[in-house]
Amino acid sequence: MATPAVMYLRRAFPEAEIAMISRRSTAGVWDGHPGIDRLIVGDDRTAARELREVVRSHRFEAAVLFPNSFRSAWFMWRCGIPRRFGYARGARSWLLTDIVVYRPQEWQTPTPQPVSKKSLRESKSLPREQPRHMVEYYLELASYVARQLGSDIAPPVVTRESALPPLVLPVQSQALEVVEKLITEEGVTSIPLIAIHPGAAYGNAKRWPLDRLAVAADRLADELGAAIVVTAGPSEAELCAELVRMLRARVLNWGPRLNIPQLVALLSRSTLFIGNDSGVTHLAAAVGCPTIAVFGPMDWNVTCPWSANAVVVRRSPPCAPCFLRECPLNHECMTAVTPDDVIAAARTLLSRQQGERNERA
């Protein structure tokens, strides 16, 4: 969701060298990205000193901290970068040279306080406008950076309804070749593909029950004459296997075998994606794949997929959003979502997309 901000900084400072420091687990998103000149990878705590030396060797003049963590600000301070831009969060202001004030009422839906029924009602009844999206959050920081460093290039106009400016995530040709080869080997080159990612690294509270996912996927596969491709993170192979055992349709269990560029290539090739509130869902939205995202405990206003081809399916009990990794109650925010809800959303989305194609033709 930071890619529009990075692309804006690229336009604002066309002659600058822009480097991205990324965790190894997400580095594939930035490999070859047009908004940056260099990718620096490192997230192992034992290698912090070596990573600092690499960063110092480039003599960067400014650092833009998209993460809100204290650790990221501490790291940039230790690297000795003269200008350090970021939001004033997590008691880290003293580590930054240039601060953007964080206003919670703009960036989050009121969180219920489960102290008593009264406190819950009060927290939900506060008059509030719809919170702004994380794409805007990152762009506001980037705009401040541009102004402070002397650029007169205006930031892009944000239109939430049309998801503009768009996310930027190129499909790598080499990764697409790998995926096309796998599809050919599976004998499904001529039929639609429904990509499904059942996991969510944040915690079980964000996972839609597998039995419901299987029912929705099977029915949609029948309607579309499609094969189902199941993907997973490195620690979710068993989750994939469990889902595959429930499916009746033609299924390709690719589990965690794809790296991020290959996963992006698969999503660009898919007719439909169904997933939870996860990073993979944002990848699907970024490449324009019709995306169904089942949301539960997190703030759908702020982190929903940024795409006109994405639909959030949710049921919001009074306790949502709670931001918990494990539900201490009955997981109503996810169990209340039915296969029919997801199927109806997918039908509407695909029908709308077909109508748009017909208009262009």
Residue map of PLM features:
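Catalytic machinery of carbohydrate-active enzymes
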Residues: 1-361
